[in-house]
Regions:
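A short, polar/proline- and glycine-enriched secondary-structure boundary/capping micro-motif
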Residues: 43, 92-94, 122-127
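Short beta-strand edge/turn micro-motifs at domain boundaries
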Residues: 102-124
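Short beta-strand segments enriched in hydrophobic/aromatic residues
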Residues: 26-27, 86-88, 117
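Hydrophobic/aromatic beta-strand elements that line small-molecule binding cavities or substrate pockets
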Residues: 67-73, 85-87, 98-103, 114
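Short, solvent-exposed coil/turn segments at beta-strand boundaries
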Residues: 25, 75-79, 103-110
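Short, cysteine-centered beta-strand-loop-beta hairpins and adjacent loop/turn segments enriched
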Residues: 62, 88-95
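Short, low-complexity N-terminal intrinsically disordered segments enriched in polar/charged residues
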Residues: 1-29, 129
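A solvent-exposed, acidic/Ser-Thr-rich amphipathic alpha-helical stretch
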Residues: 27-76
């Protein structure tokens, strides 16, 4: 499977909530770099920690946080950049913006993730401290 195919499986699993596909696609030792200056920002180590973070994101967003579009998949060796659109809503705040997910593929799985947001201030406000 090519790095782009693996990236597409990751995005599909994230969009549909397919936990089995996510577990097959993301390395148990994934390193996740969450941008910004909010309660989720920083580096998270391992699938369990990332899963817990995403679970809390879903709680905060009342289940609305989602990748709504993934348009371009661009490969450079073991790296794949994906242009995305993501959003969510919670009482008093809305998240709606473009971003880039930069994925490092190793041994057929997503091994490292760097996320980029087009409006970091909006994202920080949405997630809070």
């Amino acid at each position: 499977m090519s790095p782009i195919d693996i990236a597409k499986n990751y995005i599909r699993a994230a969009q549909t909530g397919d936990q089995a596909l996510l577990a097959r696609t993301v390395s148990p030792t994934v390193v996740w770099h969450q941008p910004g200056s909010n309660r989720f920002s920083g580096t998270h180590q391992g699938l369990a920690a990332v899963g817990a973070m995403i679970g809390t994101m879903m709680e905060v967003s009342q289940g609305t946080f989602a990748i709504t579009e993934a348009q371009h998949y661009m490969e450079n060796g073991d790296w794949v950049a994906v242009s995305i659109h993501f959003g969510g809503e919670r009482e008093g705040a809305r998240l709606d913006q473009a971003g880039v997910d930069l994925l490092r593929i190793a041994d057929g799985q997503v091994a490292e993730v760097f996320l980029f947001s087009s409006d970091p201030e909006q994202e920080d406000h949405f997630w809070g401290q």
